A protein has these predicted regions:
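Residue-level signature of transmembrane alpha-helical entry/exit and packing/kink sites
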Residues: 1, 5-9, 91-96, 100, ...
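Interfacial loop-to-transmembrane junctions
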Residues: 328-345
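Juxtamembrane boundary at the C-terminal end of a transmembrane helix
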Residues: 353-364
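Alpha-helical transmembrane segments of integral membrane proteins
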Residues: 5-12, 293, 297, 343-350
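Small-residue-rich helix-interface/hinge motifs
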Residues: 4-82, 305-327
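PDZ peptide-recognition modules
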Residues: 79-94, 106-265, 269, 273-276
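Transmembrane alpha-helix interface/packing and boundary motifs in multi-pass membrane proteins
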Residues: 258-262, 298-313
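Alpha-helical transmembrane segments of multi-pass membrane proteins
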Residues: 13-17, 70, 107, 111, ...
Length: 364
């Protein structure tokens, strides 16, 4: 079963890469730029065919996670192919810019279309109801432990107030807010818990945690959650999807900013192995909806990262094209090629680092 989820994760990555490369491919075909090769996957070659009409070689490889769309002379250093009419650099700047940008754009389109499908299928969340508090663990020496609360207990009432069906109006974590507002000298909190089908009253006196600077009882808990949904129209699904994708993109940019400026999140950042592990675990534990949500998030991520002006990525190539368009003269091709090569080497080194760390993480 685990193999199934791993293959599903590889398929997800393959779909995103294929859509990205298809963006480059169809933009090139639309603008008349010859495509040298178009491939999906990596590993042993399963299928290969060269078009007699266009000269494009189409390749399908075993592992569906990766791909490419190559052009004549795109990273040429010696300039030998500059007179070749198929050379990418001989095409108009706007044609090359459109071809470069359509890869990331198609990732955004994929994320948006999937999001619309999700909202049309499951509806719009119009309300959230919170329920009973399930105790997962109890800290040794904490107030809850001394009061007799045990893992597996379910908090039904706090000071005789029912925890079930609380609306999302600021009271959804009423049990926890009562703990936060507790002050020394107050009466202990009366918690009615369900234990093995029976109701038991326990009296808990929260304590100030110096590290957190808040009142705590020493429990790890899970709160029941029910989302109230309504069917939404196509127009509403489009609105929700646009907002969802923009919000997701904003969170990704904030995370990238923190990673670059302060190193925040470096330990949580991973490469392909970590991504596959995350997709596998989420799909296995939470189902197909989680799979689609990850597809949306990773697709937006792929589109945004590729637009960054990092040598070797689409964003960097777009910058060189903008310079050429503004000054009517390209940066020397060999200079641009070496800059992209340096970018590839750095990115490859980063990829190796994260892959190595992810593999170590798997076997800990």
């Amino acid at each position: 079963m685990t193999l199934f989820f791993v293959l599903a994760a590889l398929l997800l990555l393959g779909i995103m890469v294929m859509v990205h490369e298809c963006g480059h491919f169809f933009a090139a075909r639309l603008t008349g730029i010859p495509v040298k090769g178009f491939g999906i996957g990596f590993g042993p070659k399963l299928f290969s065919r060269k078009s007699k009409k266009t000269g494009t070689e189409y390749v399908l490889r075993l592992i569906p996670a990766g791909g490419y769309c190559s052009f004549y002379g795109e990273d040429e250093v010696d300039g030998k192919g500059q007179n070749d009419p198929r050379n990418l650099n001989n095409a108009a700047v706007w044609k090359r810019l459109l071809t470069i940008l359509m890869g990331p754009v198609m990732n955004f389109v994929l994320a948006f279309v999937v999001a619309v499908g999700v909202f049309m299928s499951i509806g719009e969340t119009v309300d959230v109801r919170y329920g009973y508090v399930h105790i997962e663990s109890v800290a040794e020496g904490g107030a809850a432990k001394e009061a007799g609360i045990l893992p597996g207990d379910i908090i039904m009432l706090v000071n005789d107030q029912d925890m079930m069906g609380l609306a999302d109006d600021g009271e959804q974590f009423k049990a926890l807010s009562m703990i936060d507002s507790f002050r020394e000298g107050d009466e202990p909190l009366k918690m009615t818990v369900e234990r093995n089908g029976e109701m038991t009253d326990v009296f808990v006196t929260p304590r100030l945690d110096a590290a957190e600077n808040r009142m705590m009882v020493g429990i790890s808990c899970r709160i029941e959650l029910e989302e109230i949904k309504e069917d939404c129209s196509l127009i509403r699904a489009v609105e929700l999807s646009a907002d969802y994708c923009v919000t997701t993109g904003g969170l990704i940019l904030d995370a990238l900013k923190g990673l670059v400026t302060t190193g925040e999140g470096l330990n949580e950042t991973g490469g392909p192995v970590r991504i596959i592990e995350t997709i596998t675990t989420a799909t296995r534990d939470y189902g197909f909806l989680a799979y689609l949500e990850l597809l949306i998030a990773i697709s937006v991520n792929l589109g945004l990262v590729n637009l960054l002006p990092i040598p070797g990525l689409d964003g960097s190539r777009a910058v060189f094209l903008l310079i050429e368009g503004i000054f009517r003269k390209p940066v020397p091709r060999n200079v641009e090629a070496y800059i992209h090569l340096a970018g590839y080497l750095v990115l490859f080194g980063i990829l190796i680092f994260f892959t190595y760390r992810d593999i170590l993480h798997l076997f800990r």
